[in-house]
């Protein structure tokens, strides 16, 4: 590449002085007439260290005058010459050419002059010196200053993983300056440079991609600098396994027994569910061990409890409610009146749009759901949800799923512990808490309903379970609802109320929870709030949980920092999707708490969150995007736009092979499977659409793991063991299916898992450290006994899911 630079000095001539002489003789005593010619005299100033080989000149002028000749060159700092015999005239031009001995520079300059009288003229010639190919040109106006030349830049190695360093080395020369006189300035489009004013800096990669490292070398003249660059590649760290891409798909509000309570695994596999435990029979009717899931009503107590002092088993289960499920088809929301209206939904295949037009209850809101067989006289345990008048594609009522409520519903006490159930959680207060904590309809007995996969319910997820690997010991990390559990999926921890700079402060008192019962009621909460300082055992609701944790043999750390209030129930982030900070309403203050997004970004590993409805704004779930709470990913538009995407963007990335290493994806509100507002079959359709998109890109599919799971159990009953890990959970089991070429075979895994297991898998697969010193991903993998693979003997312990894979397939 040719570079043109301007220097302040002149190679040729300082001054070319011309004088008119009265004739050619130097003898002043001779009286003759002038011959009407003159002569031109000049001194050639040569810059230090520059050795000229030749200096040629050409003079052209009036009446066709032309003369070309050479000047004798002496190896000195001044070369003098006189050019005689130039006729009087106006408008002469002299052109000088000089070349250095090493032939590295050829200089050319010209000037005009007149010989029209006896006075002396001075003429300056500005010469342009062209260095040999690729070095540039020089405009000279005095003593020569040749620009430095960058001869080359080497980068070793030319490609490294993010976090590693590349050695850069440049060579530069300047024919009229010593090497020590040159200054170096390096710049980079990404990463950090050590030694950026030396010839040999080191680049440390911080982000994946092509990085340009640029060098400017100067000899001190602001107008004279040489520039050159080199491109290097900072690559993402290679995964430890054949899994190069992970997609985490998160639906809403279904427990394992609610979804797979009747599932029968392939031969050679076992599963823990309602059917295998004899709680129900194969036809869904009460089984011989139905009492294991019997529900009870607690007696009144003065304060909040997580295990009542006394309780009475229901004779008849409180009936299921239609709650807020849609009563009829609607033109602007599911279930739509026709397929044209349903076509506004772009995140499922056209063949599945009909699901958005069916399933209205045909009943008023918040009444007994008589579509359930024998709804008003159900026995006091699990019941089959679907039947002759309740098809699988029907919308059903929601249930309560909040923090203090779920602690009560699971009824945990060390006094109830057994070797198979050392936590002592009986899970026998689900309908009672739904009925008692509030006067509103919160699902009543809907929490005990289950689908029947053996009668055609949940067909696509059953197919995935039959084909790939499923866990029957996966749990929601947080007792309660959507927002806090999505936070666990990213932070591996609860989110604190802070001043925005990481310092804990108290939220407004009106937001604090007080689950103590109101006077004269049986468990009607005083304030169903969203925040608690769980380091304060005297705070409402806190003491009962801390006392239980302290009584457990393994004494789990509550993980409650001093004077810190934690997010327990759904509250929107301070940031809107476009990065604007909310100024009104209730929201979680911006946080700088670290998440898996920080861990990935620190190592240059690509990741995105794909939220259904993110682009169009309708149906998008803010509390389902844990990264939207973080200042580091929301305040800067470029960073936000890099990571926050829509489902349609995921479809494009899959098709183009540009899927990041780690993807979190949550469907819009119509497709997330949430009771009342969605249907489980719609979440199946969403997952099926994504897997079909992957099928169309076999190369990408071959290295991709799709994790199909849920945020929480939604307040539905589950019979599985619950491990108390800290103040915040765990909670009930939820489905987890791993879809990849390395999880085939319909195997059922029993290792104890929760949402943080997904973080642990990502960290192990890419060699990442735990997110923080207090996050749950610090806990070890479970150690179990052969006779009870569900209960870790080293509690608290959470699997990293690696034992669900066979990388030899």
Features from the language model and the residues they span:
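N-terminal pro-sequences and low-complexity stem/linker regions of secreted or lumenal proteins
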Residues: 235-809
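Extracellular acidic, Ser/Thr/Pro-rich low-complexity tracts
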Residues: 46-48, 172-177, 219
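Structured interaction patches on ligand/partner-binding surfaces of diverse proteins
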Residues: 70-74, 99-133
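Solvent-exposed loop segments of extracellular immunoglobulin-like
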Residues: 178-185
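Surface-exposed, flexible coil segments in extracellular/virion-facing regions
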Residues: 185-203
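Proline-centered linker/hinge motifs at extracellular inter-domain junctions
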Residues: 148-150, 201
């Amino acid at each position: 590449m040719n570079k043109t630079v301007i220097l302040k000095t002149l190679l040729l001539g300082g001054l070319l002085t011309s004088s008119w002489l009265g004739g050619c003789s130097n003898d002043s005593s001779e009286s003759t007439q002038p011959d009407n010619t003159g002569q031109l005299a000049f001194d050639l100033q040569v810059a230090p260290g520059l050795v000229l080989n030749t200096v040629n000149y050409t003079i052209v002028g009036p009446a066709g005058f032309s003369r070309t000749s050479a000047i004798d060159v002496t190896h000195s700092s001044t070369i003098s010459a006189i050019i005689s015999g130039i006729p009087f005239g106006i408008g002469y031009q002299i052109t000088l050419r000089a070349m250095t001995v090493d032939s590295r520079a050829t200089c050319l300059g010209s000037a005009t002059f007149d010989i029209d009288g006896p006075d002396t003229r001075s003429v300056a010639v500005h010469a342009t010196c062209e260095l040999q190919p690729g070095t540039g040109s020089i405009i000279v106006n005095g003593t020569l200053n040749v620009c430095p030349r960058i001869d080359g830049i080497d980068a070793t190695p030319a490609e490294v993983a993010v976090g590693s360093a590349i050695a850069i080395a440049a060579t530069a020369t300047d024919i009229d300056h010593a090497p020590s006189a040159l200054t170096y300035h390096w710049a980079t489009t990404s990463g950090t440079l050590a030694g950026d004013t030396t010839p040999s800096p080191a680049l440390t990669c911080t982000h994946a991609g092509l990085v340009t490292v640029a060098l400017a070398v100067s000899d001190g003249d602001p107008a004279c600098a040489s520039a050159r660059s080199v491109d290097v590649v900072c690559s993402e760290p290679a995964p430890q396994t054949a899994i190069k891409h992970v997609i985490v798909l998160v639906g809403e509000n279904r427990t394992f027994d609610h979804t797979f309570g009747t599932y029968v695994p392939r031969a050679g596999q076992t599963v823990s569910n309602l059917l295998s435990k004899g709680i129900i029979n194969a036809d869904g009717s009460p089984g011989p061990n139905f009492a294991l899931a019997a529900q009870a009503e607690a007696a009144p107590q003065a304060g909040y409890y997580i295990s009542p002092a006394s309780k009475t088993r229901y004779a008849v289960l409180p009936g299921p409610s239609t709650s807020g499920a849609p009563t009829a088809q609607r033109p602007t929301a599911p279930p739509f009146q026709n397929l044209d209206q349903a076509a506004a939904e772009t995140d499922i295949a056209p063949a599945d749009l009909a699901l958005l037009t069916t399933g209205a209850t045909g009943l008023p809101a918040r009444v007994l759901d008589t579509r359930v067989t024998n709804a008003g006289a159900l026995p006091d345990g699990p019941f089959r949800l679907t039947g002759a008048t309740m098809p699988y594609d029907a919308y059903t009522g929601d249930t309560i799923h909040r923090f203090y409520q779920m602690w009560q519903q699971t009824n945990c006490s060390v006094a109830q512990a057994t070797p198979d159930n050392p936590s002592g959680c009986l899970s026998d207060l689900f309908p009672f808490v739904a009925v008692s904590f509030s006067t509103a309809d919160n699902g009543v007995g809907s929490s005990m309903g289950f689908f029947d996969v053996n009668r055609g319910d949940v067909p696509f997820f059953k197919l995935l379970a039959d084909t790939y690997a499923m866990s029957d010991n996966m749990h929601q990390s947080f007792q309660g609802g959507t927002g806090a559990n999505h936070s666990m999926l990213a932070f591996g921890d609860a989110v604190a109320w802070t001043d925005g700079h990481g310092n804990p402060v108290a939220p407004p008192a009106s937001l604090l929870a007080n689950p103590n019962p109101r006077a004269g009621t049986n468990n009607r909460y005083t304030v169903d709030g969203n925040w608690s300082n769980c380091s304060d055992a005297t705070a409402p609701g806190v003491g009962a949980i801390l006392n239980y944790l302290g009584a457990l043999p393994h004494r789990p750390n509550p993980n409650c920092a001093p004077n810190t209030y934690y997010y327990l129930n759904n509250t929107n982030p301070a940031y809107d999707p476009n990065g604007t900070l909310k100024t009104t309403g209730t929201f979680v203050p911006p946080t700088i708490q670290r998440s898996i997004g920080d861990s990935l970004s620190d190592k240059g590993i690509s990741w995105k969150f794909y939220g259904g409805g993110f682009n169009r704004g309708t149906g998008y779930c803010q509390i389902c995007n844990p990264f939207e709470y973080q200042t580091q990913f929301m305040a800067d538009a470029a960073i936000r736009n890099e990571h926050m995407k829509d489902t349609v963007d995921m479809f494009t990335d899959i098709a183009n092979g540009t899927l990041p290493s780690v993807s979190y994806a949550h469907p819009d509100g119509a497709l997330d499977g949430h009771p009342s507002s969605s249907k489980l079959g719609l979440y199946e359709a969403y997952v099926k659409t994504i897997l079909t998109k992957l099928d169309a890109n076999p190369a990408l599919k071959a290295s991709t793991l799709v994790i199909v799971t849920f945020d929480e159990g939604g307040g539905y009953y589950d019979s599985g063991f619950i491990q108390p890990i800290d103040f915040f959970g765990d909670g009930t089991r939820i489905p987890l299916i791993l879809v990849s070429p390395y999880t085939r075979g319909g195997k059922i895994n029993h290792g104890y898992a929760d949402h943080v297991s997904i973080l642990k898998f990502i960290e192990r697969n890419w060699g990442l450290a735990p997110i923080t010193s207090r996050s749950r991903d610090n806990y070890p993998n479970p150690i179990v006994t052969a006779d009870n693979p569900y209960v870790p003997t080293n509690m608290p312990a959470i699997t990293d899911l690696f034992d669900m894979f066979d990388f030899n397939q």
